[in-house]
């Protein structure tokens, strides 16, 4: 029988916000389809939403400067 895996640790929502005085700033990009409260994962070359599957590719600075 295979060994049981440990429980996954969830992320704290407070890690996605920065509070300064009376203002709150989001540190991660928000999904435009799902709306506020659903953050997009940042990968090497893209942003992806885990809820709806929406994906945005990052602009490649290397190819733009060569043109």
From Swiss-Prot:
Details of cofactor binding: Binds 1 zinc ion per subunit.
Record-level GO BP terms: translation
Protein origin, superkingdom: Archaea
Pfam families (UniProt xref): Ribosomal_S27
Origin species: Methanococcus maripaludis (strain DSM 14266 / JCM 13030 / NBRC 101832 / S2 / LL)
UniProt similarity note: Belongs to the eukaryotic ribosomal protein eS31 family.
Name of the protein: Small ribosomal subunit protein eS31
GO terms assigned for molecular function: structural constituent of ribosome; zinc ion binding
Gene3D superfamilies: 6.20.50.180
The protein's assembly and partners: Part of the 30S ribosomal subunit.
Required cofactor(s): Zn(2+)
GO cellular component, one term: ribosome
Zinc finger residue ranges, C4-type: 31-52
Binding of Zn(2+), residues: 31, 34, 49, 52
């Amino acid at each position: 029988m295979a060994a049981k895996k440990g429980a996954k640790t969830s992320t704290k929502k407070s890690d996605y916000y920065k509070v300064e005085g009376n203002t709150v700033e989001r540190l991660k990009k928000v999904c435009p389809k799902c709306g506020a409260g659903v953050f997009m994962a940042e990968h090497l070359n893209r942003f992806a939403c885990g809820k709806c599957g929406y994906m945005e590719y990052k602009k490649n600075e290397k190819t733009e400067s060569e043109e």
